[in-house]
Structure formats: structure tokens, C-alpha cells
Design a protein with these regions (language model features):
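Basic (Lys/Arg-enriched) interaction patch that binds polyanionic ligands
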Residues: 170-221
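Ferredoxin-like alpha/beta domains used as RNA- or RNAP-binding modules
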Residues: 1-174, 180, 203, 223-247
Length: 247
């Protein structure tokens, strides 16, 4: 679905929640779709929370709650389930697991993160497709065994990050991306022109686009990072930037 369709659907769900006084929810959203919802003016008054089944989830479901309901009253396990797939041999990759899931006719919006570690993977999904995913017995060329596990059994791995500190003349996309990804401004300019750099999960072709604290920069094929802080200046008048590069 396009971002506009996602926003329209979310706004409809928010109105339904308000009108009926009962919770509503989307399917699993990409980080870009979540960002769009978080910054949609039509949803600024909505009691909206996001859950992905584990603390560091990238793909999340947006829940719209009525005014009488607190966020901690939401039972996430009623909406998100987890499956552990264990390979009999070999170590299938993320693409292999995704191929097996899509091959069963399960839409991507029904599936959350796929956490791959060695010969195992944990798949987050909505309850309506749980039975289908539990029937998976082969991923790529590897036989697998699928079992449901509780969300509490998902290992807490945490995001591995590397702190980056650098200075810029001004907090614009090309300058911040160069410091974050350790690239020359010339190379970054080429990457931006090629559409390989995203600002807050959206392709940005403007080298001078302003970057602020909390923004996420993504370089396709390399990784992504988040701007943790911008402020202060060096003796030469350059601004200090602190960022976290996700590994």
C-alpha cells in the first residue's frame, strides 16, 4: 500500500475507535509508514501506540485506543504471536525465510520482524496467519521445524550501535551523512543523486535538506543511523553532531 493509502486507513481506524469506543489497529507497518503516522496532523489527537512484539521491533502495529483505555491495558499477545523456526541443517537467511512466508500467500502486512540467528529464526505475525506459518516445513533447501513461543521467550538482543561524533558547517543532509557514514561530501552527493540515501525512511534528493535531532538517515546497502544531538560549536564555528550508527 502507498503511504497515502496507509494514512487514510489509519485515519479511518482512529475515527472508528473514537466513534465506537473500542480499540482498532493496523497491520504491521514499515518504519517509513510508522513515521508517516507519527507525523500525520490528522492523527495528532489520537491515542496511538505502537507495538512490534519485542522492544527493538522495526515493523510495528499501530493501535488506536479509546480515551478510557491506558496503553498498559493493551494485551499485545492477543494481536501479535511469535513462531520459532529451527533449521535441521544450514543457516537460512532473512531472504530465505521471507520467501517461504510469501510463498504461502501470506501478505507482508501480516508479518512483523524476522529475527535470524544462526540456524534459527523468530517470526512475529498476526494471529490470523499463525496456523499457516506453523505449517512451514522447508525454508530454501533446509527442512525446518516450526513451533509457537510466547513473546516473553524472544531473546533480548538489543540494537548494536556505534557512536559517531563529528562537526559540520551546517546540519544539512550531505554534511551529516558524510560524517555519519565516513564518506566524502563528493561521494555522498553522488549517493543522494542516485536516490540511495533516505531521510526518515523517505528518499531525499536534496543535499541541502535540513537534518535535526532524532532524524534517521539510511544509506542503501550500508546501514542507517540516528542523529542523537546537534548543538554547540567549535572554535572554528562548526556545529557538533552526535549520532548512533546501527550495526
Amino acid at each position: 500500500m502507498l503511504s497515502e493509502e496507509i494514512l487514510k486507513r489509519a485515519e479511518d481506524l482512529a475515527r472508528r475507535c473514537e466513534g465506537r469506543g473500542t480499540p482498532t489497529n493496523t497491520g504491521f507497518l514499515t518504519p517509513a509508514e510508522r513515521y508517516a503516522l507519527e507525523h500525520d496532523q490528522a492523527l495528532r489527537e489520537a491515542n496511538m501506540v505502537f507495538h512490534g512484539g519485542h522492544p527493538d521491533a522495526e515493523r510495528c502495529i499501530a493501535f488506536f485506543l479509546p480515551d478510557w483505555m491506558e496503553a498498559d491495558a493493551l494485551d499485545v499477545s492477543e494481536h501479535i504471536r511469535a513462531i520459532r523456526l529451527t533449521a535441521a541443517f544450514g543457516e537460512p537467511g532473512h531472504r530465505d525465510y521471507m520467501g517461504a512466508i510469501l510463498g504461502m500467500g501470506v501478505g507482508r502486512e501480516w508479518v512483523g520482524d524476522i529475527l535470524v540467528e544462526g540456524h534459527e529464526a523468530i517470526v512475529l505475525c498476526q494471529p490470523s496467519v499463525l496456523r499457516h506459518l506453523l505449517s512451514i516445513d522447508k525454508v530454501g533447501r533446509c527442512g525446518v521445524k516450526a513451533v509457537e513461543i510466547a513473546l516473553s521467550e524472544i531473546p533480548v538482543r538489543g540494537k548494536k550501535t556505534e557512536e559517531r561524533r563529528f562537526t559540520v558547517m551546517s546540519p544539512r543532509l550531505d554534511a551529516v551523512a558524510a560524517g555519519l557514514f565516513h564518506l566524502s561530501r563528493t561521494e555522498v552527493t553522488r549517493q543522494i543523486a542516485a536516490g540511495l540515501i533516505q531521510l526518515n525512511y523517505t528518499e531525499c534528493l536534496k543535499p541541502d535538506a535540513p537534518v535535526k535531532e532524532g532524524d534517521v538517515l539510511t544509506l542503501r546497502g550500508t546501514g542507517k543511523g540516528k542523529v542523537a544531538g546537534i548543538g554547540g560549536s567549535s572554535r572554528k564555528g562548526r556545529m557538533f553532531v552526535t549520532a548512533e550508527l546501527y550495526k
